[in-house]
Design a protein with these regions (language model features):
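Low-complexity, intrinsically disordered regions enriched in charged/polar residues
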Residues: 4-8, 20, 31-35, 70, ...
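Flexible, low-complexity segments enriched for small/polar residues
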Residues: 2-6, 10-23, 238, 242
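Active-site substrate-binding loop specific to GH73 endo-beta-N-acetylglucosaminidase modules
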Residues: 40-42, 56-57, 71-75, 107-244
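N-terminal accessory alpha/beta regions
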Residues: 21-121
Length: 244
């Protein structure tokens, strides 16, 4: 393969597995070799992370992306400057699929933490990603699972989990949906100590066993006293669920 084709192939790789790369850097990657670069992209933990001190220098009131404009600038800065492009690209991919917004969540730091979760788990199994999304305070609030109680279920999270995030319409029944919602009762959010007297409270996932429905549930042909993680275990074994 000619050097020009090598450059073109490497540029294509970085457009797909990242956000492009400066022309002068392509020469070094070509010299390293395509297969070696792919392995490097697939192991972001071997590359340095963005130092938050750089962001504090640019935004003295940074405080971990505490308002939407800084929240957005934080992420764009990381996309441009990361040494882990595939990790950042996967965070964007999962954010697009598991979309939440400050228009409802109204907690920019929590949205930033959710994006950080996508960075951490973006290259893991789909099961692990679904579990982390289900425990994400931003998603819990976005799809109202904090209002999903034993004896008074809210189906929003269960419906999105089955319809949009895994099986798709036609591959589950309304009874499956209701029983999935029952399995996620007690999965809620709890506020933590605020950053400062005027700041938003950080959130954390909280499981309230006293609010969980422990009754028998039938889900996709399986019967048992399922909790949320067991529902996800069943979902990821279904042929209709995409493989990642």
């Amino acid at each position: 393969m000619s050097h020009r084709k090598d450059i073109g192939l490497m540029a294509h790789l970085f457009r797909r597995a990242g956000f492009g790369v400066p022309r002068q850097d392509l020469e070094g990657y070509v010299a390293k070799g395509y297969e070696a670069v792919v392995e490097e992209l697939l192991h972001p933990e071997e590359q340095p992370v963005i130092n938050d001190e750089l962001l504090y220098r640019m935004f003295p009131g940074y405080e971990g992306a505490a308002a939407p404009p800084i929240n957005q600038a934080d992420w764009v800065f990381r996309m441009i400057n990361t040494k882990r492009p595939l990790e950042e690209k996967m965070a964007l991919f999962w954010h697009q699929l598991f979309a939440t917004s400050n228009s409802k969540v109204d907690n920019p730091p929590e949205l930033t933490r959710q994006i950080a979760m996508f960075r951490e788990y973006g290259l893991s199994t789909y099961r692990d990603i679904l579990i982390e999304v289900a425990k994400s305070p931003a998603m819990i609030f976005w799809l109202d699972n904090h209002g999903n109680h034993n004896g008074s279920i809210n189906e929003n999270w269960g419906r999105e989990l089955l319809e949009l995030f895994s099986l798709g319409v036609g591959n589950y029944s309304e009874d499956d949906l209701r029983n999935a919602a029952r399995a996620f009762t007690g999965w809620t959010v709890a506020p933590k100590i605020p950053r400062n007297p005027l700041g938003r409270f950080y959130w954390e996932f909280e499981y309230k066993p006293e609010d969980h429905d422990y009754g028998e549930k039938e889900f996709l042909g399986h019967t048992g006293n399922f909790d949320g993680e067991e529902i996800v275990d069943i979902i990821v074994t279904q042929p209709a669920t995409a493989r990642f």
